[in-house]
Amino acid sequence: VRWLQMLSNQEGIQEVPAFSPQSNALLDSIVAEFSVDDARRIKEIERTTNHDVKAVEYFLKEKVADNSELNAINEFIHFACTSEDINNLSHALMCNAARETVILPYVDQLIDAITDLARKYRTVPMMARTHGQPASPTTMGKEMANVAVRLKRQREQIAAVSILGKINGAVGNYNAHL
């Protein structure tokens, strides 16, 4: 959907004129209101096509069929995109969303909980170990603080990773885009 909207915003692609607000609203609603029933419909189409991305393409064509403006350019829904272009970008978006909405918030909660334990047990003595052998005295709080600092460092590294995708055709040379 976003690909089709982007095509309509390119002056150089005259075959896909700029969409009206109504057509853009319809496309936005397909994304925003995507339902389990929609997913079932795609799986139903896929049983015929034996191709996941082609099933999504046909589903989108069904959704825009009653809009004359979008129906007129529906062959551009999959224009210049291989299935891998679509899939890897989808996977990248899903991974990024999972990282931002699930993983990092959970790790933040974990860091906070371990930091609280470090404060709570800051005076509780324990024997530190090195190579599995008793070493020197420390506190449970200090050891928990070490874990929190190390986890925070790893969290920052995970957050800094750029999750990328590609959209450059079957062999990466943009031939379909020319």
List PLM regions with ranges.
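A helix-coil-helix interface module used to build multimeric assemblies
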Residues: V1-H177
